[in-house]
C-alpha cells in the first residue's frame, strides 16, 4: 500500500489529490484546493508551500506526481505557474518524497486513454476509477488524475526497476 499525492499547480488555485495504491488498484483518500487569494506573489507562493506541507503532514504520502509547466501564450502566467510548481516541489522535497513530473498529455493518456481528452472526460474517468459519487472541483480532479497517472507509471516501472527512469535533481523524468 502506497499513498500518492498528485498536485495540479497554480498561482491562485493549486489542486491536490491523495490516492492509496494497493495490489487491486487505487482508492480515493482526499482531494481539494489550496486557494491563495489575490495577495502579492510571494505571499501566494508561501500559501502553496505551507498548504502542500500540511497535506503531506496530514496524509503521509511517500511519493508525489506534479504536472509539468506547459508553454502558455502569456509568458508571465507561465512564469507564475512555474514558481507555484517550485513551491510545491520544495515542500515535497523537504518531506523526503519521491517526485515525478508528467505532461498534461501523459496524464490524459494514462487516465482517459487519449492525450487529447478534455477536462470533463478526465473528470469522468477519475470518478469512475476512484468510484466517486460526486464531482470533485476541477483542480482537485486534475490533481487526482495526476496521482492516478503516477500510480500507473510507478506500477509499470517497478517491474523494470526505477533505475530505467532518468533522475535529475532528485526528480524522476519519465
Swiss-Prot record:
Top-level EC class: hydrolase
Q: Which family does it belong to?
A: Belongs to the RuvC family.
Q: Could you tell me what this protein is called?
A: Crossover junction endodeoxyribonuclease RuvC
Q: How does it assemble?
A: Homodimer which binds Holliday junction (HJ) DNA. The HJ becomes 2-fold symmetrical on binding to RuvC with unstacked arms; it has a different conformation from HJ DNA in complex with RuvA. In the full resolvosome a probable DNA-RuvA(4)-RuvB(12)-RuvC(2) complex forms which resolves the HJ.
**Cross-referenced Gene3D superfamilies, in alphabetical order?**
Ribonuclease H-like superfamily/Ribonuclease H
Query: Which CDD domains does the UniProt entry name for this protein?
Result: RuvC (cd16962)
- Which residues of this UniProt protein bind Mg(2+) 2? 67
